Every structure is written in structure tokens, then in C-alpha cells.
Curated annotation (Swiss-Prot):
Modified residues (N-acetylalanine): A2
Membrane-related topology note: Single-pass membrane protein
Pfam families, per database record: Tom22 (PF04281)
Modified residues (Phosphothreonine): T43
Protein name: Mitochondrial import receptor subunit TOM22 homolog
Composition skew (Acidic residues), residue ranges: 27-40
Organism whose genome encodes this protein: Rattus norvegicus
Region annotated TMD, chain positions: 83-103
Name of the gene: Tomm22
């Protein structure tokens, strides 16, 4: 402490360690640790509820109304998306899938006819794309 008085008289600034004696600094740290333990007893919801008191009632009610509105809109959009997905899926299955199946069936039938022609008339008839029932092309003129 005498060093602090001598330094103050010389016009030099004092450091915080020089101002607070060692025993008091240790007590202050223990008090802070005890205060931290007291603060840990609060739950998160209690702390958040306590923070609402620093905002005016008008701001709190506006925030609550905004939250309620956003929740309502989210619920409506969820219900709409479910209904739209159901309508789209069933419409696709009723209107589009039969057409897809029929075109695939037609392609398979054409492929089978082409294979039968190749088996009956020879391997070059499938590639030439001649008229069905026509004579095969001459071997020298391809």
C-alpha cells in the first residue's frame, strides 16, 4: 500500500492490482463464483421471461401478434401443400400414367414384331427398315 501512495505522489497511474489488496481480490473472486452459482439456478425460460420486462407492452404484444400470424400462415401453407400434392399426384396417376403405359406397350409390340421379322427373314431386314411383307433387299445392293 505504501508503494501505491508513493506512485500516486509521483504522478504515475495506478494499476488495478495496486489499488485492490490481494486478500480483497481473492474474496471478490469467491463472491463472483457464488453469484454465478446463484444465477445458474434459473432456468432458461425464467431468464427469457425476465427479459420481456425490459420491453414495453406495445412491443411485446406486436411481437406476439407477429408470431401468431406467422404460425397461422405456416399452418395454412402446410395444409394447402398437402392438398395440392394429393390432387397433383392422383391427377398424374389417373391422366398420365395410362398414356405412359400404353406407349411403352406399343413400343414393346413394335420391338417384338421387328425381332420376329429378323428371325424369319434374316438379320439384315431389321436394319433396312423395309416395308412389312416386302421382299428382302438383294445381297449385292445394300
Amino acid at each position: 500500500m505504501a508503494a501505491a501512495v508513493a506512485a500516486a505522489g509521483a504522478g504515475e497511474p495506478l494499476s488495478p492490482e495496486e489499488l485492490v489488496p490481494k486478500a480483497e481480490a481473492e474474496k471478490a473472486e469467491e463472491d463472483l463464483e457464488e453469484d454465478d452459482d446463484d444465477e445458474l439456478d434459473e432456468t432458461l425460460s425464467e431468464r427469457l421471461w425476465g427479459l420481456t420486462e425490459m420491453f414495453p407492452e406495445r412491443v411485446r404484444s406486436a411481437a406476439g401478434a407477429t408470431f401468431d400470424l406467422s404460425l397461422f400462415v405456416a399452418q395454412k401453407m402446410y395444409r394447402f401443400s398437402r392438398a395440392a400434392l394429393w390432387i397433383g399426384t392422383t391427377s398424374f396417376m389417373i391422366l398420365v400414367l395410362p398414356v405412359v403405359f400404353e406407349t411403352e406397350k406399343l413400343q414393346m409390340e413394335q420391338q417384338q414384331q421387328l425381332q420376329q421379322r429378323q428371325i424369319l427373314l434374316g438379320p439384315n431386314t431389321g436394319l433396312s427398315g423395309g416395308m412389312p411383307g416386302a421382299l428382302p433387299p438383294l445381297p449385292g445392293k445394300i
